[in-house]
Each structure stands twice: as C-alpha cells, then as structure tokens.
C-alpha cells in the first residue's frame, strides 16, 4: 500500500504544475520506495494522457552522507547497492543502510537521465534553516537533504536554476 499511496505525490505535483512535466525532481531516499512510487505515478498520468512524455524529466536521488549506499553505487556505476553497516546521519528517517529498493532506484535513475548525490550533516541543517527562513517551512532532516542537494547541484551547474524543479520535502 505504501507505493500506491506514495504515487499521489506525483499526482499532486502534476496538478500544481498545471499538468506540465517537471524538468528535475529531487527525492530524499532511504529505502528507495518513494522515488519508485513517484516515477510510477508520473508514468500512470502519461498513460491516461494527463501528462505528455515524462521520459525527459530527470530524477535525482538525494541521500545523507553517512548513509548513502545508492549514491555510492551510482557514482561507481554499480548495478547492485552495497549496504552501509552503521548508518550515521542526522537524517534518521533516511538511515536505511540496506535499501530494499536500491537496485530499482538505480534503474529509475538510468531511465530518467538522473543521478544521485549526497550531502553532509552541516549542509542538511543549513538547508533546514534556509527553508524555514525563506519559505516558512519547517521540515525534518530528510527534507533538508533534498534542499541541500538542490543547492549543491545548482552551484555545480548540474541543474539550471531556471528549470521547473520539484524538491520533495518530507
């Protein structure tokens, strides 16, 4: 039921974007189930002709340093995720050392021209503060992970700040 329920993230985003496909989606990743569900939701919206081609959107998996097995696998071009034995991060909800859907996330990143990136505890906490100060949104650390990765990717030129960007804040 988790996957089916999490698909609604994509339904809500599509409606808020007036049925336009986002360019970039940044998802905080623990087990990987939410990222897979979001992809499935966008695909279903395309199937019923509510969205145009979703294959051009880019999925980005965001993980905290100290528990980033999917990021490690992606950067090493591995097809399998090697578990982290002792996760150590302020983002406790993402501290899943052996992500059950990790292999599927890697497939989704390839399918959607995406990538995976990590951020450290200080970057996470700074992003939480930034979000609170600029948007009045108070998030748990997983939300800080996605915001921090967004900042990092814009600074590195991997994401154009003028793109239609969706950053999932949980």
Which ranges hold each PLM region?
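Active-site/ligand-binding loops adjacent to catalytic centers
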Residues: 1, 44-139
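Active-site/ligand-binding-proximal alpha/beta "capping" segment
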Residues: 1-50, 126-131
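Short glycine/serine/threonine-rich phosphate/pyrophosphate-binding segments
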Residues: 3, 29-38, 67-70, 143-150
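Short helix-terminating capping/connector loops at secondary-structure junctions
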Residues: 19-21, 50-56, 158-162
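Residue-level preference for the first positions of well-ordered beta-strands
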Residues: 24, 136, 164-166
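Short beta-strand segments
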Residues: 27-30, 60-63, 167-170
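Substrate-binding/catalytic subdomain of NAD(P)-dependent oxidoreductase enzymes
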Residues: 30, 57, 128, 137-150, ...
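Phosphate-binding loop/pocket of nucleotide- and phosphate-handling active sites
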Residues: 82-85, 145-170
